[in-house]
Structures are given as structure tokens and as C-alpha cells.
Amino acid sequence: VTPISRRTLLAAAAGNPRFLYRDYSRCLPDYLSGLAAAAYARRRREMAALTTVEAVRKRQRWARAAFWRLVGGEPERTPLHARTVGGFERRGYRVEKLVYESRPRFHIPALLYAPAAGSPPYPGVLFQMGHSLNGKAYESYQRCCQALAQLGFLVLAFDPMGQGERTYYPDASGTRTRLASADDEHSLPGRQMLLAGDTATRLQVWDAVRALDYLAAHPLADPARLASTGQSGGGTLTMLLAAVDDRLAAAVVSSGNTENVACARYNPPGATDDAEQNFVDGGPAGFDRWDLLCPFAPKPLLVSVSAKDSLGTYSPRYLEDGREEFARLQAVYRVLGRGDRIAWAETPLPHGLSYDSRLNTYNWLRRWLQNRPEPLVEEPPTSPESDASLWVSEGGNVVRAWNGETPASLLRAGLRRVGPAPLEGLLRVERPDAGLRAVRLARTASRGLTAEAIEVRSSARVWLPAWLFLPERPAPDAPVLLAIEEAGRNRRWRESELWQTLARRGVIVCAADVRGVGDLLPEYGRGNPRYTGPHAGEEDFAWASLIFGRPLAGQRASDLLALAAALRAHPAAKGRKLRLAAAGRMTAPALFAAALDGAIDSLYLSGGLVSYRSVIDAEEYTAPLASFVPRILLHTDLPEIAASMAPRRVVLAGAVDAAGRTLPAADVRALYGAANVEVRARAQWDEAALER
């Protein structure tokens, strides 16, 4: 006896025994959940196997190597060209203003807080900033640096990428960003870097390594007693540095991103964050954020968190996942015989470097770097300075002051081709199953045609809904049209609209949705809407897809391959050519699919991105991360992919630059010189464009 499916029961309960649409909004979240579950299970097994010192040491070596591999490789050390440009004295400490270069002409402004009392060499502390717009001038960060200096520590505080004097997208003032936040100063260039095989993670961690180079070599510092600390993004930067630099003797991570993306109760799209905190391909590699701290064991480590951070700053799973992974790392410390060197602290206060969190930092560093176990119960007197009084550069912007490099200029200068690579591998495409067929959910009449609601299974947990409009009298030589646009299949289905109009002219039309589009627009995650609302956009799902090794552009190309295969097998389409048409942000996946499927006879692209190189060359851009493919510019670009389709015809109508501006046809032709590519000046998405 064939069991009755849940879907059939629900349909019957609704009074309609024929069909019931799926909740397609679950498809992309469920697909990612499957990838997350596999990554979590793998890492859990591997961590559970760390029962000997030898196993731990092997894992530590693996974690460091995996980190450098994922972020783009360890850069070459170049001269720092450090120089002191000013300073001042305060009661109990003095401040030196200095600048150095983490890469040639890539300037890092920093402050060195030196104790006025005691005798050198002092233990050194690298203080790393959270995402404060004013960087090292942020009030609570100043207080911590001032207090540490008065407690006998030599402290180096530097502006991170895109913050303070390193604002790379300044407004008219020259010192404030014109972007929405410091996060955007990180992620705007960080997304560009992915196309060229680089990452914001690599840039940020190398800035920290070079800062530690300066601190370790300072005549007042004891290179055997170096630590790193920071709050929020600075805590995460401390984690990055702990993964790669053995010179650290202690660390305090305060409200850092201590949440794995692949966690026990993964809540799609998961704990994605700004660019440097997302490890592309980390999922299939078995690497996640807590692996950053594995190479640091068994050195003294304090992980300090805010109990309110799971209510909006980080994901709703932040605390429970952090505690679970802390226990795993604590077990590693115990295997190494130093369970006393790792601790967890919580504050009930909101996200910030609060007074109690600062005291925890002082006491941890005093205990392990100064051999002072007695707890400090009161912070030394502090008095934050004005932003301008801490400027190292004239005018408060190092790029303008010294005509230096930016992340974008470094990226453009360093871009090199390394040779061809299979497009299928870059995209991580999943080919459709042999014999794939569309499932007809319903069939109904319309004026002059028949409309079918069909569904195609593309991957595990992913079904693609589509409308198939079948003319009463199909034109004998007309190809089947498979059409996709970012507004989804329901945008133009009505009698007087595009799809039915084309069908009444004799064209078989399939208007479909792919992952993240139309009915497959993903549902919100569960939990506090202060977090789940802002983290439910396409970019968050694109980041999650990249982390789990399945670029969203590749997923959408896979969907189109499945739809094309199913259409070719449909009785009404057999023997007909297949034409694929895409508009706007769907053009890149369509080009990929057509290049990979030689049975797609022709391709029409309206209003699509002209090239990935145009994204690299743009200072600002609107091209979406969902269309980006990591490392693609090392091997190829969109014009070459279009040329690879020859002799099949490709039409580019109204191609746009990275900011979405329509380009002159002559400029597009200069890039697309292949004989099989026709360039049209204006984007069209109407009967005239799609019928021929």
C-alpha cells in the first residue's frame, strides 16, 4: 500500500484533492541548513577526536594552514617605514603618534601608550578596535588603553581598515565616511576582493601582524610578554591574530564574533557578518570561527561576552553556540594540561567595552603577563581625548595626507591572471539528474492558450516553480523561451502581460523562479527581529552560500540547468530549440548556465552587468554579491564566457557598469568582440525583444 503523503493530506484538508503549492520560501534556507548540518557534524567529530597532545598539535597546524588557504595566503613582509610624528604627556603615561606601512604605501596610523612609571621592558598589548567610525579615538577604547598604560603595559592602538584616519570612502569633510557604517567600509572592498581571490580577512589580519612586528621590536617592549585584546570587531581581530602569530603570550576576546556559522541550531542564513568575518569555503573545509583560537592553546585566553548580544548585535544563537564551542576549546586546553589558562566571563550590560569588561581585561593581563593574581577592583583614572587631538595625519585622513594606497587600489594593482579553470568548478554547479522531468501541479485554460503550473526539483530540498504557457497554435519554428527576472515569475503572468501575449503569438513560454527569487524568496530566520530582519536580505544568503562552498550565482545556474533539462523533456517542447532570456541581476547566472549547457540554443541578456572587471575598477558599485563568483577574475570574465558559447548566438541589450549605469554600445562592443555576440544599445524586455 502506498502511504499517503503529508502534502496529499494537507491538500485534502483544504478541500482541494488535486494539488497544493509548497512553501517555496523554505527551499534556500533548507538547502543551506543541510550544508550547515554536514559542516557542523564533521567539525564536531574532529574536535571530539582531540584526545591526545599529538592530535591537538596536528589540529593546530591544520587550522593555521587552513586559515591562510581560505583567506588568500600569507602576504610578504615589506619594510614598515615606521616614524613618530608627534605625541603628548599625561599623568601616568605618555602617547606617541606614529605611522607605519603594513604594505608599501598602505599607511597605518597608531598611538603608542607608554607607562610613566616602572622600568622597561614592559609587557606589550596590541589593542584592536571594534567597528567604531572614529577608530582608536572611541571613548571606551581610549579609556582601556590609558588604564593599561598606567598599569604598566606598553599599548599599541591602531586604526583598522576603513575606520578613524583610514576612512577610504570619505565625505566632503575628509574624515567621515559617506557610507552607512564602518561595516560598509570593510565589506564594500571586501566583496570586490573575492572576485580576485583575495579577502578583507587577509588584509585585516596582516595589518595586525605588522602592528605586532612594530610592538615586539620596540625598545620598551618585552617581546616574550605580548598580548592582544579588543572589543566587538576588535575581539574578532584578536581571534584572527591568535590564529597566525605565535608571539602572543595572552589574549582577551571581548564581545568578539564567537559564534560559528555552522552551529548546532543553524538559523538560516546564519551568523553572517561583514566581509572579514566570513570565511568563504569554510564549511566544506571544516573550518569555522572557533578554529581561529585552536592554534593559540594552551596560552592564557579570556573570552568575555555580553549576555545581551544574542538580542540583536549577534544572532539569537550567539550565546548558546559560544558556550558550546568554548567547552570544546576548554577540553583542548585540558588535553594540553592547562585547563586553568582559559576562562569565560559574561556581563549583563549591552554590547560595548563596559567598565566591568575592562576590569576583567586588566586582571587577566596582570595575572598572566605581570604575575599579579590579586584582582584590581577599580580602574585607574581615565580622560578621553578629542578625536582631532589623536590624529596622526594632517587633516585626519592618511590617504589624503600621504597620497597612500587604499584596499581597492592595492587590489587593482595586484590582479593577475593565473590561467584557465573549469567554469563548473568555479561555480560549484550541481548538474541535473538524468531523466529529470517537470511535475505538472495544475493545468488551466486562458484566452488562446493553456497555462500549466509546473515544478522542477533542482537539488536536495530545492524545488523550482514555473508557469508554462502553451499556445493553442504554436509557431512551427519558434524556440521554447525560458525566462527569468529578479522580480520573479509572477511579475508578468496576466492575460495582457508579457508571457501570455508571447504565447498567443505562438511562443511556448516558461517563466520560472530560482533560488532567492519570486516564490523562492527566503523566509526570515527565527528569533529577535532586531537581528533576523536586517539579516534576511539576499546578501546574507549570498554570504552563507559562499561560506558553505556553493556560490548563489552557481546555485541559480544549477537551477537554470535543471529547468532547461526538464523543459527539453516536456512533450510540448520536444524537438524545439531552447532560448534562455534573463534580465537585470539574473543575467550572470543565465550566462553561466548557457555556457555549461550546449543544448541551450541562444541567449538574450537585458540590462546585465558588463563584466566583473568593471566591479574591481569601480570605487562604488551596486552589483550584488549574489552574482559574484570567488576567484573568477583569476581565470576568466563575462565577455570570455559569452565568446565560449560560439557559434551559439548571444544578445546583450543595454549592458550596465558596476553601478548599474547603461553603457554606450561602443564600449560594450570593445569588450565583446566575438562574432557570436550581438550588442544592442538599449535594454528591452518586451515582445519585440523576446519573440525573435
Question: What do the PLM-derived regions correspond to, one by one?
Answer:
Residues 1-13:
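N-terminal secretory signal peptides and thylakoid transit peptides that target proteins
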Residues 15-108, 289-291, 297-299, 304-465, ...:
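Alpha/beta-hydrolase-fold serine-hydrolase catalytic core, especially in secreted/extracellular enzymes
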Residues 113, 128, 158, 229-231, ...:
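Generic beta-strand/beta-sheet core signal
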Residues 120, 124-209, 216, 262-267, ...:
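Cap/lid segment of the alpha/beta-hydrolase catalytic domain
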Residues 146, 239-240, 294, 500, ...:
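Alpha-helical segments flanking ligand/cofactor-binding loops in enzyme cores
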Residues 213-284, 563-635, 641:
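Primarily recognizes the serine-hydrolase "nucleophile elbow" in alpha/beta-hydrolase
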